[in-house]
């Protein structure tokens, strides 16, 4: 037997034993009120592995599975102002326009895709007979509109407009309280580089802005874990420490809410993640040109101002301008620090009207530098966006209870609205590029900017350099993902995809600054806002998505058709009964598709009903019962806890604590452990 095959054999044994350990821990935990017996579980795993490892008779390096300790470099790159639906709503295998759990507005009694319109909205007015607008393809007019809309704008990204669009959880004011352009979207042909990177590695379809507002609140959370609202972990009066950061105001002093309370006070003085990195002995560097679009918010903190005056290391690493060319060079030579932050120039940031195409050119250069650099085999590169930029998305994260510290505040612009959530907000494009996420599928855990901090904390701990960002709100730390489930350390693939060509971003010949948006708007005489298709839509065309699937990673969320697969079989509802059928490689058999209906109150609550697809969007079909039958009555439905560990999913009936299983083509609930692979499917 070849070394590779034996290594794979042992890895498979490790995964199998690990899955069994996970199940036994789960069973023990339920029996003991949530307290797991880690010692006995470890002995089970050891007993399962020793004979297999001995039989393999290989060096440890051949059999060992990877770990977070194998990651030597982490690269963060945050772009600007794009929403998930706006970019990836049509993508196959993600929670997009094909969402079977789409929210039904209590105001309209329709899925939120039906956005009410009237003549009070900003932008082009609808004809009097048109009462609603669906999401619409921005380049529906054809011709050169694929170039024109590159430099168009949507609407407002501020607190007021985005809370209005949310509308207390009804999501039905995107057009009325922003603009009809807000619900426009691109397709694959408009974003070939973005799609290629996301699908060649791991795309996240549950990554949320941390604050339902603009750039500074979100970028500051990305680097500190907080905006310092009242009762937050930072504490102290805003006039002393700064915050609460509600908008992009950067001038000294404080703005005021409509009742006169201080907000967005400057300078800010609470502790930042880079300071924790320095204390832990972790090297880091912000790579940015002098033109950085103001996207390095560390300059707003007094400690960085003081460090710059004294020419100290904190300022050299956090607020200086080594340039993006320095990043490309360091990546190529394998000289990147342990943690790198990439900050975009204005015209390459993708912030409307700055073009996705120019942003793609920068993304391609950064990805190429990382993937072709000498440290690619031990690097994790995380690409995210700060906030939605006035573009619509149809999913917002569950919010914390109102008594959670730092999570709610009296609406700063209209106190009559009462308490408002600070976040997490709508979803953003997000992908992780690394040898442990190659062809990784879709990551479904609720995630936000705080998640990147928590990933760094876990990574630092694995390297013996622990730190803890105490400024982060406790609810975010408890309920947002730390991204560890996104990486599959049982698979290691350093192959590099062929990336599509992207035209070189243009520069002004005099100033040498990038000027793509200016060139675009001048070429088309600023006629870049497409016609709003009032009265010309049908819902099927508006919500057309790519047919396909992606393997899932991470704890599950709603919003997708699923196949439950085990071995050669898939769960089925053929013949109006729960059964098992031979799985389809295309995952397009309707009777093998199911939909989850979430019963939880917070993101870590993983209780679901499992149903067949409904005949209407947002409605369930028939539910799986505890006796493994099907019922149209939700009261008859079994409640399952579905969790992800060791690369598979356990599906446990919460009443009997038995595992849903497919054994030799038969469906059962059994006491022994069973694991499924889940695929997210669009049809």
Spans of model-derived segments:
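Context-dependent free N-terminus signature
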Residues: 2, 29, 44-45
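Cysteine-centered motifs
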Residues: 2-5, 23
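Short linear segments in intrinsically disordered or otherwise low-structure-confidence regions
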Residues: 7-8, 12-14, 21
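Basic polycationic patches enriched in arginine
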Residues: 11, 24-25, 30-32
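Intrinsic-disorder-associated, low-complexity terminal segments enriched in Asp/Asn/His/Tyr and depleted
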Residues: 15, 37-38
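Fungal secretory targeting signals
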Residues: 42-59
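N-terminal pro-sequences and low-complexity stem/linker regions of secreted or lumenal proteins
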Residues: 60-657, 662-683
């Amino acid at each position: 037997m070849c070394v590779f095959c034996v290594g794979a054999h042992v890895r498979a044994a490790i995964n199998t034993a690990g899955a069994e350990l996970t199940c036994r821990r789960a069973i023990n935990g339920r029996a003991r009120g949530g307290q797991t017996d880690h010692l006995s579980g470890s002995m089970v795993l050891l007993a399962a592995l020793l004979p297999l490892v001995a039989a393999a008779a290989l060096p440890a390096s051949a059999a060992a599975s990877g770990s977070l300790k194998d990651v030597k470099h982490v690269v963060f790159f945050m772009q600007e102002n794009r929403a998930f639906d706006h970019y990836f709503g049509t993508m196959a295998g993600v929670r997009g326009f094909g969402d079977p759990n789409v929210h039904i507005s209590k105001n309209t009694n329709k899925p939120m895709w039906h956005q009410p319109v009237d003549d009070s909205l900003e932008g082009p007015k609808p004809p009097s007979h048109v009462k609603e607008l669906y999401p619409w393809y921005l380049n529906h007019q054809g011709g050169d509109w694929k170039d024109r809309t590159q430099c168009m704008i949507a609407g407002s990204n501020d607190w007021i407009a985005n809370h209005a669009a949310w509308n207390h959880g009804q999501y039905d004011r995107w057009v009325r309280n922003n603009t009809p352009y807000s619900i426009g979207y691109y397709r694959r042909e408009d974003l070939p580089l973005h799609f290629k990177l996301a699908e060649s590695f791991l795309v996240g379809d549950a990554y949320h802005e941390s604050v339902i507002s603009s750039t500074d609140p979100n970028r500051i959370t990305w680097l500190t874990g907080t905006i310092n609202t009242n009762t937050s972990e930072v504490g102290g009066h805003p006039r002393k420490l700064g915050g609460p950061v509600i908008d992009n105001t950067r001038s000294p002093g404080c703005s005021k809410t409509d009742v006169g309370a201080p907000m967005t006070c400057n300078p800010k003085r609470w502790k930042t993640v880079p300071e924790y990195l320095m204390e832990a002995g972790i090297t880091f560097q912000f790579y940015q040109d002098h033109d950085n679009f103001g996207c390095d918010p560390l300059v707003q903190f007094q400690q960085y101002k003081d460090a710059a005056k004294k020419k100290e290391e904190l300022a050299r690493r956090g607020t200086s301008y080594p340039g993006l060319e320095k990043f490309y060079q360091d990546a190529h030579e394998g000289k990147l620090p342990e943690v790198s932050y990439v900050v975009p120039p204005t015209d390459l940031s993708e912030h409307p009207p700055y073009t996705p195409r120019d942003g793609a050119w920068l993304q391609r250069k950064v990805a190429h530098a990382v993937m072709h650099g000498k440290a690619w085999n031990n690097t994790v590169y995380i690409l995210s966006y700060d906030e939605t930029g006035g573009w619509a998305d149809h999913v917002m994260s569950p919010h914390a209870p109102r008594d959670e510290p730092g999570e709610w505040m009296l609406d700063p612009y209209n106190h009559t609205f009462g308490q408002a959530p600070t976040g997490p907000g709508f979803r953003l494009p997000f992908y992780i590029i690394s040898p442990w996420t190659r062809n990784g599928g879709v990551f479904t855990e609720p995630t936000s900017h705080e998640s990147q901090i928590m990933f760094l904390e876990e990574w630092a701990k694995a390297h013996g350099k622990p730190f803890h960002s105490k400024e982060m709100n406790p609810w975010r730390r408890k309920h947002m993902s730390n991204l560890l489930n996104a990486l599959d350390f049982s698979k290691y693939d350093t192959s590099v995809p062929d990336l599509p060509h992207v035209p070189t971003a243009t520069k002004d010949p005099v100033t040498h600054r990038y000027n793509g948006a200016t060139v675009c708007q001048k070429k088309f005489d600023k006629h870049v806002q497409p016609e709003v298709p009032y009265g010309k839509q049908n819902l099927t065309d508006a919500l057309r998505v790519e047919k396909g699937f992606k393997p899932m990673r991470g704890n599950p969320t709603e919003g997708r058709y699923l196949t439950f697969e085990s071995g050669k079989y898939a769960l089925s509802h053929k013949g109006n009964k729960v059964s098992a059928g031979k799985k389809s490689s295309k995952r397009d058999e309707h009777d093998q598709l199911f939909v989850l209906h979430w019963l939880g109150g917070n993101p870590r609550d993983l209780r679901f009903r499992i149903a067949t697809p409904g005949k209407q969007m947002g409605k369930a079909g028939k539910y799986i019962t505890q006796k493994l039958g099907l019922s149209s009555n939700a009261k008859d439905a079994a409640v399952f806890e579905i969790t992800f560990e060791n690369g598979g999913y356990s599906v446990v009936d919460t009443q009997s604590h038995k595992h849903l299983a497919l054994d030799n083509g038969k469906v059962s609930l059994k006491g022994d452990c069973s694991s499924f692979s889940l695929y997210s499917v669009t049809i």
